[in-house]
Amino acid sequence: TAEVLVTGRKADRNIEDAQTSVIELEMKTVKELPALLGEADIFRTLQLKPGVASAGEGNSGLYVRGGGPSQNLVLLDNATVYNPGHLLGFFSVFNADAIKSSTLIKGGIPAEYGGRISSVLDMTMREGNMKAYEFEGGIGAISSRITAQGPIIKDKAAFIVSGRFTYLSFLLNPILERQENPVSI
């Protein structure tokens, strides 16, 4: 009599998740890319990715796979942001220094995000440093930014404060004050 031993082995799977059309954006990448007037912008960085376009230089809206900006869902820590652009559409409202992570879902949007047909941009804010105080900032052609973070109670509670300030009011006020009747009817 002969003895036969049969063994089987599952093939090694390199693909663990079938979710496609997802862009994970590192804030380090956003800060390293050349920026319009020296201001790092998450939306401008996303416009460099496949399937995402802009409507021109003066527009920060996301046009994902043919959809318009109103067809995108923008979330910041699970809260909906209804108007993610400012400064006449040149920049998004998000300070890259205060954002921890950013995920753009361009297709196959999960049901939990319902209501938008173009994309979902899900961003998470940074948490403050619980061990040491840190300060960072920058000066650009039209704005400056600063971020401060540190422990309130070491290893238990922390703070982070981040802000941007533009110089455009100083540049435009003298011009606007000279115009006595800027609109003719």
Regions found by a protein language model. Give the residues of each.
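Predominantly transmembrane beta-strands of Gram-negative outer membrane beta-barrel pores used
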Residues: 73, 101-112, 118-126, 133-184
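Periplasmic N-terminal accessory/gating domains of Gram-negative outer-membrane beta-barrel systems
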Residues: 3-109, 120, 126-127
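A generic structural signal for short coil/turn motifs at secondary-structure boundaries
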Residues: 33, 131-134
